[in-house]
Amino acid sequence: HHLKADGGVMITGSHNPPEFNGFKISQDQHSLYGKKIQELKSLIDSKDFETGSGKIEQTDVLEPYMEHICSILNIPRKVKVVVDGGNGCFGIVGPQLLRKLGLDPIEIFCEPDGTFPNHHPDPTVAENLKGLIEKVRAENAELGIGFDGDADRIGIVDDNGNILWGDQLL
């Protein structure tokens, strides 16, 4: 959205095991799914491709993204928070963003690794929050946040290591 690009592709498996990684495709700033994705599959299967020239541009979107988040959030005091990156993409930008927001992040499993060596990347399953719970308690942190592979799903742990489920966060 920030670049107003005509389309995009993200490699993700979200909270699924690595063998389910695939492409999340967008066109005109909308996700491609259902009939549209089936039409794309048919084009690929038919090998009826248009040819032409194009170009590749590289743009840093992380800095503008962090600036935007910092402009809309105001955290009045430093909070010690343990973050479990789930070995997904959160580790690329998350800890840096939290520091810019004035938080004190303690990182676990923030090294991106698509084989997810530390635990399955679904933070809505209690079994996958064990490391986060232990670290929150060991560090006397105020909060723990676990992320899935593409950082669009979270699991929350309070300062005592208790899981706060989605309906409790409301």
Feature-to-residue mapping (PLM):
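Ferredoxin-reductase
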Residues: 1-28
